[in-house]
């Protein structure tokens, strides 16, 4: 996985107003992705959560025809918003949700 720069984060998620953003994306052949965002307000975080949901939907549509075996990861994507923070994780298994749920 590679860390995305600010321009890529904005292109992928439509988020340009985060106080902090860290996004790691796979090479493109797989769907794994993790993103953490921090915002000034809960309203901004809620908006980013909706943008993340749209990102996952778009990825699902792309992978259905490109690499269909990756769709399960997208179907089980974890998107959590707590206060001013948003976390997104696309990976195998339930571990991601269990780990993120401890912090969100």
Sequence positions of predicted segments:
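Short, compositionally biased low-complexity segments enriched in polar/charged residues
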Residues: 1-31, 43, 47, 74
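Subset-of-secretome marker
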Residues: 1-3, 12, 57, 63, ...
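Extracytoplasmic/secreted envelope proteins and their assembly/folding machinery
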Residues: 6-9, 45, 49-53, 93, ...
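Aromatic-anchored, charged helix-turn/loop surface patch used as a conserved interaction hotspot
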Residues: 10, 32-36, 58, 62
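Second-shell loop/turn segments in exported
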Residues: 33-41, 85-89
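Hydrophobic transmembrane alpha-helix bundles
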Residues: 39, 60-65, 97-104
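Short Gly/Thr-rich strand-loop-strand
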Residues: 45-82
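A short, solvent-exposed beta-edge/loop patch
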Residues: 70-104
């Amino acid at each position: 996985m590679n860390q995305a720069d600010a321009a890529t984060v904005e292109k992928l998620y439509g988020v340009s107003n985060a106080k902090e953003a860290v996004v790691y994306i796979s090479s493109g052949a797989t769907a794994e992705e993790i993103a953490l965002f921090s915002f000034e307000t809960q309203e901004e975080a809620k908006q980013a959560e909706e943008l993340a949901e749209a990102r996952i939907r778009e990825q699902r549509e792309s992978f259905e025809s490109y690499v269909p075996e990756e769709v399960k990861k997208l179907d089980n994507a974890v998107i959590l918003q707590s206060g001013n923070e948003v976390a997104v994780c696309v990976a195998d298994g339930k571990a991601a949700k269990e780990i993120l749920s401890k912090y969100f």
